Structure formats: C-alpha cells, structure tokens
C-alpha cells in the first residue's frame, strides 16, 4: 500500500478532535520555558514534560489572557474559578482535573512561589476536592487516546491492520460491544447511509446504531475485498471469509496499548482494555449533551428507559440523526 493511500486512510480513521486555540504570548512562553528547564534538570521524562506543558498552557492562558493576572498574583478564589472553567467550559473529567491540581502544585514549587497556591492546596485537602477517584473496573478511552491507539495499529506491519483499525473505529462510533460489531452481517448493514442493525445483543433487544461519514467511506472500500459478500456473510472477515475472533481484535488492541504505555504516552496504571472504548463513548456522548436516556438506548444498556425502547419511530430517528451530526463534526 502506497504511503499516500495509507495517510488518507489514517486521516479518515482518526477522530477530528476540536481543541480550543490558545494564544501563546511571550509571557506564557517565558513561564513554560522556566518550568521546562527546571523539570528537565530534575531528570523528568520527556513524555511527562510534554504532557505537563500541554496542561500548563491551559492554566497560563486562563490566568494571563482571561484573568489578566500573572501566576504569582492569583488568589485562592482565582484557582477556584480556574477549576470551574475546566469543569464547565473545557469539560475536563474529574480525574483529569486532579492531574491539573497535582501539576499546579509542582509548577508553583519548582518556580519557588508555592506560597501563592498553599492556601488553595490546604483548603482543597480539607474539603477533599481532589481526593483520588476510585478506579473503576476499566478506565475509559477518550478521543485523544483512541487516536494514538489507531495510529499505532495503522503503523504496525500487520496484514490486517486496516481491517483491525476499522473495527476499533466502528466500536467507537457505535458504542457497541465487541461481539456485536464482529457479529454484523451484510444484511444488518445499510452501507448507503451508515446505519446498522444490532440483532444478537446481550439484552436480547434489537437496536440501531450509526457511524461517521469517514468510517462509512472506509467500510465501502473495505468490503470490496471481502472473500464472501452474501447477505448472511460477516461484514468483517478473516482470510477464509469467516468471522474475526474476539480474541484477535482484543489482542491487537492490548498490544497497541502496551506499546503506548512503554512509550509513556498512556499511564501504566490505566486499566485500558477494548471494552474501554464502549465506556469512553458513553462518557463522550454524555459530555456532548446527549440526554442520558438516549445514550442508554443507543448503547443498549440493561437499565435503559423502557419508554425509549417503544418510542415512536420518528423520535428514534431524530435520536440517531442527533448522534450522526455529532459524528460528522468530530
């Protein structure tokens, strides 16, 4: 496969993540440079420094460009405002807010002005604001992490790398369980509109899901090379035209995650498995304002509202169209 074709496939597979543009002024650059020099002298890993600088830019942008203050001029109330900004404007998760909190403690300590943040730190400790969040059975995958995993799979030497990356991208778009995507057959798929019928579900309830236009373009190209193309044949096939094994795609995902952990791009204490995509998709939809009852129906959770299951077809179509619009603007 030519490099240009591979790049086009990568561009289609990777999620379009919108990030608020930060105006990096000379003053912001000065603080970043001071922090970077100190951390490098401390022998901190480059990958850690990079992720810290990314978060620090957000903080410096807020206090310098929004509040009009230098970091050493902040009051306790300003730190409260910043974390409210992370929560309500940037939609930063609670676990990520804790990372910002830990970073700011380091920032003020290494720049020798810890007294500025000390009151906020003590107050936060007393009020258990950033107490360690209980680790769930699996951690969720977000769009940024998913892109790293997809790129790792695409760049591998595997003969099935495009198929495997496409399966994982469809898992994100649809929020499906792995078995639900691998069980898809041609008769379940509307490849003109990117609509899929999920029939053999854990809850024994049929549901309809959708995919993005980028995923659909790749699917249309991929199915041309399937060994078998009858209505009862699987959408994703192995070299003999049979169903792709769940163990295979789980191992592909696990290998990519482990490599990223070794590179320091994913924290080693994160419990990331292929089912983490489903958890992450649920969080992503809720963060984007999709009503919780629609998310329950879309993902096929056992606790989904029964009134939505039997809702009028028009209401169900509107729900799907709403999710399709979100996929198009990612």
Swiss-Prot record:
Residues 22-112 form the Core-binding (CB) domain. CDD domains: DNA_BRE_C (cd00397). GO terms for molecular function: DNA binding; site-specific recombinase activity. Keywords: DNA integration, DNA recombination, DNA-binding, Viral genome integration, Virus entry into host cell. PROSITE patterns: CB (PS51900), TYR_RECOMBINASE (PS51898). The keyword DNA-binding applies. Residues 136-325 form the Tyr recombinase domain. The active site is at 177, 202, 275, 278, 301, 310 (o-(3'-phospho-dna)-tyrosine intermediate). Gene3D superfamilies: 1.10.150.130, Intergrase catalytic core (1.10.443.10). InterPro entries: CB, DNA_brk_join_enz, Integrase-like_cat_sf, Integrase_catalytic, Integrase_recombinase_N, Integrase_SAM-like_N, Tyrosine_recombinase_XerCD. Pfam families: Phage_int_SAM_4 (PF13495), Phage_integrase (PF00589). GO terms for biological process: chromosome segregation; DNA recombination; establishment of integrated proviral latency; symbiont entry into host cell; viral genome integration into host DNA. Belongs to the 'phage' integrase family. This is Probable integrase/recombinase protein MJ0367. It comes from Methanocaldococcus jannaschii (strain ATCC 43067 / DSM 2661 / JAL-1 / JCM 10045 / NBRC 100440) (Methanococcus jannaschii).
